[in-house]
Amino acid sequence: KGEFIKKISRRAKYILIKFNNGTLVMHLGMSGSVSVVPSIEALKKHHHFELVLDNATSMRFHDPRRFGSILWQNNNEQLNLFKNLGPEPLSSEFDDEILYLSSRGRKKNIKTFIMDSNIVVGVGNIYASESLFQAGISPKRAAGKTSKKRYQALTQCIKIILSEAIKNGGTTLNDFSNIDGKPGYFSQVLSVYGRN
């Protein structure tokens, strides 16, 4: 009570809500969602957290599968959650050089490699499949045996695919919805994900 929201941001799959005394750290898990609704609206099943705002609205965390989490970080605390995370894929810190150098000596396949959040965050199964297809790279190819030229193409494709997904409101396959409760439409333009 009496706290002010100073900033809302994101790091990897974490939503960060900065207050005067600390930061609320939310992870949506597999099927969690956040919505902003009138405070008088009744709580629904699987609403596990409510932040009541002073404008008669509430931010609610809905998590039917209970894979999500909510943590509080005091201003003077460092959370280990972010320590080993790779760069954001749409940031200038993410480039083909980082991917190429990180891949040297790795035997795992390239799809698993780019889905590793220690390498780059935010490239999940759908976006890895689509990016590799667009770059013309087999997902089974060994990460350590992939050329720098292929990593240049892959990096560009990751950035394009993720930008397109954001522009289309995300990818709704089962139960994903954005903060307004609307589905994402990127699933309508998927080239390979979910196909045999």
Task: Map each language-model feature to its residues.
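Phosphate/anion-contacting hairpin/loop surfaces
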Residues: L24-G122, Y127-Q134
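Generic beta-strand structural signal
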Residues: R10, K18-F19, L53
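A glycine-biased structural micro-motif
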Residues: K1-K6
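Basic, nucleic-acid-binding surfaces and adjacent catalytic neighborhoods in DNA/RNA-processing proteins
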Residues: S9, S102-N196
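Short, solvent-exposed polar/charged micro-motifs at secondary-structure junctions
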Residues: L16-K18, L71
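Short, surface-exposed charged micro-motifs
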Residues: K7, L16, E50
